[in-house]
Amino acid sequence: FYEVLKMMGANITFENIREDSGEKIADIRAKYSKLKAVLVPAHFAASMIDEYPILAILAAKAEGTTRMVGLAELRVKESDRLIAIYNNLIKCGVEAEHGDDWLEVSFCNEVVATQTIETFHDHRIAMSFLILGLTAPDGVAVDDIKMINTSFPEFFSRLKELGVKID
């Protein structure tokens, strides 16, 4: 995921790199940067299958059209994430196209969510589209948030720490 963000021009760095339970972890420092669309090759899919929902959100704010390929595994996660991502992007006014194992997302200057985001009880879909809602004048509404506590119980408190207003 980090490599794809760097390809897109993200200004991010790792600090305080360490190991926890046999996995590398770090603090991430991110600064504003203008993102650009990229082709995300299929060889990234296995290592970042859970990051595609948030990557699609970032793609909606990247100049150009981002194409992600090799996404068949997204269809058999907690939900058919490929369709969930696509349908919800369309609900937010983001231009997108998809096929059996690919997704294209085009830059969207103004996100306008006129319909409730359908999460399909998938925490990653819920969190990703709530983040997209931060760029919408009136935010977004999602149909369910209970499942977010499963993976990130501090999600809303962290957003509030950043000054996000949550209704």
What are these model-predicted stretches?
Residues 1-167:
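Short, structured segments at the rim of ligand-binding sites
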